[in-house]
Amino acid sequence: MTSTRTETDTFGPIEVASDRYWGAQAQRSLGNFKIGWEKQPLAIVRALGIVKQAAARANMALGRLDPAIGDAIVKAAQEVIDGKLDEHFPLVVWQTGSGTQSNMNANEVVSNRAIELLGGVMGSKKPVHPNDHVNMSQSSNDTYPTAMHIACAERVIHDLLPALKHLHKALEEKVKAFDHIIKIGRTHTQDATPLTLGQEFSGYAAQVASSIKRIEMTLPGLCELAQGGTAVGTGLNAPVGFAEKVAEEIAAITGIGFTSAPNKFEALAAHDSMVFSHGAINATAAALFKIANDIRFLGSGPRSGLGELSLPENEPGSSIMPGKVNPTQCEALTQVCVQVFGNHAALTFAGSQGHFELNVYNPLMAYNFLQSVQLLADAAISFTDNCVVGIEAREDNIKAALDRSLMLVTALAPKIGYDNAAKIAKTAHKNGTTLREEAVGGGYVTDEEFDAVVRPETMIGPA
């Protein structure tokens, strides 16, 4: 039988497993919120550790916290930051919308670990109290939003942006490799005028580059922190200068330019910066969906599709059709993009629900944002390494499609007029003949004139 210790809160005593650092409120949450399997993201756990350490340092600097207690909190919080106490954060996403249970989970874990470091008895709340000391100058209402911003900014900066830059570099390499290959363009999924395969891939590279810039533009908002607003934004029970000092400490811990939000009422009641930042992530998903779709369609075949690209063959594709290989990386990426679209819909609605002085959809917003970041970062790397870098052009198929395209007639329009050029294309399509046969046979141009004008290599840029 598991040994327990007695923890207490304002509701009275409750038993907690002896080897767990959490306390009464986290234990009650385990019983009260048996909902789903989605746990608080470890990025949030780390961020809560950062907040607790920064708050202890700020409170000591402002003369509010006994240095002996503060130093123990700093050490215990560092273990949270380093991931050494992850197993002691068992709570699910689906809890109070302010994240109070998770904030108290952090307070209790840091308190009990600090007590242990000081040689005290876990659960005694002495000499380190979870509320009076670990949560000093804080409220869940400003702590969890601060942790959200820290976690989301860290993961965007350290995971998503590097992954997108990795993809961008690979696409740029394909732009150079394919620059000499002229192919038929397609608009409305129908034949259009020529371009190079490199030009086509340059569009993909530009989409990713623009996505990176858009996401970076949203970081200043994510780097504004609610800490110091306490319960409703007034800063009640926090000393003058605490908000600025704690933001300074968080910036020092993370190496990211976090600052104190200029208006704490907005920082608690609205999370527009989260919605805005995820909007850029959502736009990135839209871009990646388009890129993955184009690549898998251009690689369709191998004999009965467009067949302009040869995609890497990573695994068998069918349990019934021998030899079949599928564009699995494209399919995985597009599924991720769909999930991000759904996350954005939920996050947008949640962001609109700041009733009066507090938004109470915080855990949902944090979970969806962080899931989008992780999925897109992982998928971008997987797509790059297992698909993009190995893409090859099937130049024979590309040339065959170019040679039989009727849209090369566009080059004749300035010479013989739009209507005549249209007649040539329609007649050639109806009769199954070539543009040359109809243009020369119809007396519109001579063979020499046709050769001088209908040259795909001269049609890939301004005249």
Swiss-Prot record:
Where is the chain membrane-spanning? none
Quote the catalytic activity from the record: (S)-malate = fumarate + H2O
Domain of life where this protein originates:
Bacteria
Q: State where substrate binds.
A: 98-100, 129-132, 139-141, 187, 319, 324-326
- Name the residues annotated as site: Important for catalytic activity: E331
Q: What EC number is given for this enzyme?
A: 4.2.1.2
UniProt entry keywords in alphabetical sequence: Cytoplasm, Lyase, Tricarboxylic acid cycle
Principal localisation: cytoplasm
Tell me the InterPro entries matching this sequence: Fum_hydII, Fumarase/histidase_N, Fumarase_C_C, Fumarate_lyase_CS, Fumarate_lyase_fam, Fumarate_lyase_N, L-Aspartase-like
| UniProt pathway | Carbohydrate metabolism; tricarboxylic acid cycle; (S)-malate from fumarate: step 1/1
SUPFAM superfamilies for this protein: L-aspartase-like
| Protein localization | Cytoplasm
Q: Which GO terms describe its cellular component?
A: cytoplasm
One Gene Ontology molecular-function label: fumarate hydratase activity
Active-site residues annotated for this sequence: H188, S318
> Which BP terms in the Gene Ontology apply to this protein?
fumarate metabolic process; malate metabolic process; tricarboxylic acid cycle
Show the HAMAP family listed in the entry: FumaraseC
Family under the similarity heading: Belongs to the class-II fumarase/aspartase family. Fumarase subfamily.
Role, per record: Involved in the TCA cycle. Catalyzes the stereospecific interconversion of fumarate to L-malate.
Question: Assembly and partners?
Answer: Homotetramer.
Q: What else is known?
A: There are 2 substrate-binding sites: the catalytic A site, and the non-catalytic B site that may play a role in the transfer of substrate or product between the active site and the solvent. Alternatively, the B site may bind allosteric effectors.
What's the protein called, per UniProt? Fumarate hydratase class II
The record's gene field reads fumC
